[in-house]
């Protein structure tokens, strides 16, 4: 039991007027540590007990069992709890030594599946920084869900269908060079895509020609299908090379095209449930009772299916295939209205499991404050960006530690980790401005800063030639080690908060706080001095490194032992 839960349970024993969960949520951390480790404000009981908060605090402080704490005192309207540092540090250190990287493993999920729709780039378009957010947020959430006892199923719902293929076929037939595309597939396809979109803005017949080619593709035309398959194959080769660099894997690459033969069933289900309504020659589902208007188009007058219809088929397929406990869509916040419609239509169809679906939205990545756009050619391509990040990391490592073994692997871990961490430390609903120099810095709230703290601890443990013993009791009581102990003890709750809120930034900020707390401890404590506290301090180092490494792993970031 963590200390916050312990305090809430002890207060609940003497305050039957409040639920333990409510007490837990009211607990505060005093700004000054001299005022205790946690405090309960008595204001919330004033109305119920019809007494002044100061009097309530004083009376309750006397009733609470102090045996679990160093002391419990009333200060004005607050009950302040001072925790038993020796006892708690001993328990926490023992837990980490015993469990190792499994420390804070939880069983909420009980092995149930979580479907995660993530990354999902468009075929024949370059993998840009804009795709990075969905990829790394989804990958981190998969790690977090696994830590919570779920079985993540990572789905790359490729954008391998749609009118853009009509545009690309038109462009290739006008200006395409097979040899050039084979030599540099994505670069050439991007040039063609940008060029045809520019032409479409001044020539309206381009759009019609593209629609015609896409209709041919839908009808199985041989030439259209062969070009589509070629564009898809070349793009996947490129994407998989990048995923390898990012150390991201998937359980499914079923994209839009996979569901082409599943549209009729969706339409039949909607019709059987009498949900389709005629509107100006098209078919819609009315969702006014959900506050959604206008109604989503299901089928156009020409028989073409729309975005919402093409989202219903994957939702149904995933429920049948994975019987998910949760289904998560890591997609930009500009798609919020679409996901509200999707859930509402499924609800109308009688599928209450739609409540288990969550749109994990995120903000935009900008460059110099400007929105990125593939269509306009204003993109930051991921592959050269990763290469540049690795080069910058290598330069800093060379300056700090020229004799480091395996510099290339460490530079890769630091460079890639820097890009991932910078993205994940940002509250996902907020966007951020892309700044590679800030990302790869070893100073500030960055991935390399946290990785360096971990490497520093490993260096200390190597110098000391120290391995903790599971049969020895270790404990600490000084103020700076106590700050670290409290963070380590809080790790299980941080994991659950990250999972409950679908918010990896909670974990990233925890990692920063733990690294900062250790660096402060390192600056003021002679860890390797040969005295009675040496082993206790080294165990604290070991526990900190264990939790830092695991926090980084949950974010999809490697933790080198040397830097």
Swiss-Prot record:
It catalyses: tRNA(Arg) + L-arginine + ATP = L-arginyl-tRNA(Arg) + AMP + diphosphate. It comes from the Bacteria. It holds the Pfam family tRNA-synt_1d. SUPFAM superfamilies: Anticodon-binding domain of a subclass of class I aminoacyl-tRNA synthetases, Arginyl-tRNA synthetase (ArgRS), N-terminal 'additional' domain, Nucleotidylyl transferase. GO terms for biological process: arginyl-tRNA aminoacylation. CDD domains: Anticodon_Ia_Arg, ArgRS_core. InterPro entries: Arg-tRNA-ligase, Arg-tRNA-synth_N, Arg-tRNA-synth_N_sf, ArgRS_core, DALR_anticod-bd, Rossmann-like_a/b/a_fold, tRNAsynth_Ia_anticodon-bd. GO terms for cellular component: cytoplasm. Belongs to the class-I aminoacyl-tRNA synthetase family. PANTHER family: ARGININE--TRNA LIGASE, CYTOPLASMIC, ARGINYL-TRNA SYNTHETASE. NCBIfam families: argS (TIGR00456). Monomer. This is Arginine--tRNA ligase. It comes from Streptococcus pyogenes serotype M49 (strain NZ131).
């Amino acid at each position: 039991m963590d200390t916050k839960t312990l305090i809430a349970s002890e207060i609940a024993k003497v305050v039957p007027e409040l639920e333990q969960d409510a007490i837990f949520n009211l607990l505060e951390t005093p700004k000054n540590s001299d005022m205790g480790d946690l405090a309960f404000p008595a204001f919330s009981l004033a109305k119920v007990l019809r007494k002044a908060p100061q009097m309530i605090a004083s009376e309750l402080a006397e009733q609470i069992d102090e045996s679990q704490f160093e002391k419990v005192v009333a200060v004005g309207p607050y009950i302040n709890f001072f925790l038993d540092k020796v006892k708690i540090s001993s328990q926490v250190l023992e837990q980490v030594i015993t469990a190792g990287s499994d420390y804070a493993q939880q069983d909420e999920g009980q092995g149930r599946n979580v479907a995660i729709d993530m990354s999902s780039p468009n075929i024949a378009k370059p993998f840009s920084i804009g795709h990075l957010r969905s990829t790394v947020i989804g990958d981190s959430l998969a790690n977090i869900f696994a830590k919570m006892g779920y079985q993540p199923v990572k789905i790359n719902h490729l954008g391998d269908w749609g009118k853009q293929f009509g545009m690309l076929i038109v462009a290739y037939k006008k200006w395409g060079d097979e040899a050039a595309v084979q030599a540099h597939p994505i670069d050439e396809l991007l040039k063609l895509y940008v060029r045809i979109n520019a032409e479409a803005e001044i020539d309206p017949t381009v759009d019609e020609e593209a629609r015609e080619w896409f209709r041919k593709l839908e009808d199985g035309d041989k030439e259209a299908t062969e070009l589509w398959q070629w564009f898809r194959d070349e793009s996947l080769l490129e994407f998989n090379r990048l995923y390898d660099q990012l150390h991201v894997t998937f359980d499914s690459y079923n994209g839009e095209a996979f569901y082409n033969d599943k549209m009729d069933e969706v339409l039949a289900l909607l019709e059987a449930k009498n949900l389709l309504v005629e509107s100006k020659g098209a078919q819609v589902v009315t969702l006014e009772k959900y506050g959604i208007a206008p109604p989503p188009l299901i089928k156009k007058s020409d028989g073409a299916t729309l975005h919402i219809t093409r989202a219903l088929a994957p939702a149904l397929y995933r429920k049948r295939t994975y019987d998910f406990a949760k289904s998560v869509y890591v997609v930009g916040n500009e798609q919020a209205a679409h996901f509200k419609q999707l859930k509402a239509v499924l609800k109308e169809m009688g599928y209450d499991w739609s409540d288990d679906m969550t749109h994990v939205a995120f903000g935009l990545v900008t460059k110099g404050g400007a929105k990125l756009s593939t269509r306009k050619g204003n993109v930051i391509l991921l592959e050269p960006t990763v290469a540049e990040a690795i080069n910058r990391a290598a330069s800093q490592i060379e300056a700090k530690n020229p004799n480091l073994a395996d510099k290339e692997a460490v530079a890769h871990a630091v460079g890639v980790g820097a890009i991932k961490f910078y993205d994940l430390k940002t509250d996902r609903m907020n966007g951020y401005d892309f700044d590679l120099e800030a990302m790869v810095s070893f100073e500030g709230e960055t991935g390399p800063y946290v990785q360096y703290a971990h490497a520093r601890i490993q260096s200390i443990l190597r110098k000391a030639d120290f391995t903790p013993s599971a049969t020895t009791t270790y404990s600490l009581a000084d103020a700076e080690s106590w700050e670290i102990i409290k963070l380590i003890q809080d790790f299980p709750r941080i994991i659950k908060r990250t999972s409950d809120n679908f918010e990896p930034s909670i974990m990233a900020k925890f990692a920063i706080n733990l690294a900062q707390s250790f660096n402060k401890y390192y600056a003021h404590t002679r860890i390797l001095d040969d005295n009675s506290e040496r082993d206790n301090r080294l165990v604290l180092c070991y526990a900190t490194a264990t939790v830092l490494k695991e926090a980084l792993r949950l974010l999809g970031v490697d933790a080198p032992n040397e830097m």
